[in-house]
Swiss-Prot record, chains A, B:
Its EC number is 2.4.2.7. It comes from Corynebacterium glutamicum (strain ATCC 13032 / DSM 20300 / JCM 1318 / BCRC 11384 / CCUG 27702 / LMG 3730 / NBRC 12168 / NCIMB 10025 / NRRL B-2784 / 534). Homodimer. Pathway: Purine metabolism; AMP biosynthesis via salvage pathway; AMP from adenine: step 1/1. It is found in: Cytoplasm. Keywords: Cytoplasm, Glycosyltransferase, Purine salvage, Transferase. It catalyses: AMP + diphosphate = 5-phospho-alpha-D-ribose 1-diphosphate + adenine. It is an enzyme of class 2 (transferase). InterPro entries: Ade_phspho_trans (IPR005764), PRibTrfase_dom (IPR000836), PRTase-like (IPR029057), UPRTase/APRTase (IPR050054). It comes from the Bacteria. This is Adenine phosphoribosyltransferase.
């Protein structure tokens, strides 16, 4: 297929297929970790993935891009810039100075929490598209949605580069559209 | 001054002055924390700061943008995209799957480390501009430079949004140009 005929998503899928680094047994035995660092470090691949994710976020009527700490920052920031939007940094607990709004969530072992500043930013009534690199269990993304809704923001959808099948991730995301750049594996 | 006459840096400085959130005694007593989350969450301010940092990175002949985990990702990713470059995610210890290259550095209390993948990315001979939100002690940025040089990359300079004066940050950065968007306070 000629370069022009390739859609934005095709180019992004090619980049992900070519540059993703696969590492067995990380962070624990039995997990195949998909490291996108080489995708982002390569100009052509990085631009291709950002372009596809921006196209998806625009379809979801994004007014602000929500980036998940920390790998979601690496994609969400560029997508926000391309669309001329702000990027909402959804931080892990303790990273932001008080006062903050906090949303706890269950992990496989124990709990974690996400936070937003409770001053200086007003997301009430805004359409927020949440961006991260991978949809796995969906726990973090689900918590991010609750956090945003607790600040009267509206999550109009999720855009991810890749998805790990079989972990029930989409069940945690509620009735919002989920767009994943790479085809399910 | 009319909108057109304002330089890229003037617009960015206005955005930082207007939107930065100041919080006393965070992360510890006596520290005035400057939270840029509201700057990034506002479309106009975010674009203004990214444009200024991209202008600076271009002056420093960037071939790749190095973003420091995690707030450096929020700026470095957009700057890289604007310049059509890749973004090198310089991660905190343990976040990347092996094999990795590690650079330890001293903290006020204890040590920390930064890591890069030792496969899948080739930065040998490349001009890398390091981007973070704040220049404080310069410890993390100095370690990032050593890490990149250990992979035969070349740090052609640093671009920061703001600088905390009086912490000797520049002493840690070696003989490379440092561009800070906001005027020294």
């Amino acid at each position: 297929m000629s370069e022009q005929a390739l859609s934005t998503f095709d180019r992004a899928r090619e980049a992900l297929d070519k540059k993703t680094r696969y590492v067995q047994d990380f962070p624990e035995k039995g997990v195949l970790f998909e490291d996108l660092t080489p995708v982002l470090g390569d100009a052509e691949s990085f631009v291709a993935v950002v372009d596809a994710m921006a196209e998806a976020a625009e379809k979801l009527n994004a007014e602000i891009i929500g980036g998940l700490d920390a790998r979601g920052f690496l994609l969400g920031s560029a997508v926000a810039y391309k669309l001329g939007l702000g990027v909402l940094a959804i931080r892990k607990k303790g990273k932001l100075p008080p006062p903050v709004v906090t949303q706890e969530y269950e992990l496989e072992y124990g709990t974690a929490a996400l936070e937003l500043p409770s001053e200086g930013i007003d997301i009430a009534g805004k359409n927020i598209v949440l961006i991260d690199d991978v949809l796995a269990t969906g726990g973090t993304l689900g918590a991010a949605r609750k956090l945003i809704e607790s600040c009267d923001g509206h999550v109009s959808g999720y855009v991810l580069a890749i998805e790990v099948p079989g972990l029930g991730g989409r069940d945690n995301l509620g009735d919002r559209p989920v767009i994943v750049v790479r085809d399910p594996q």
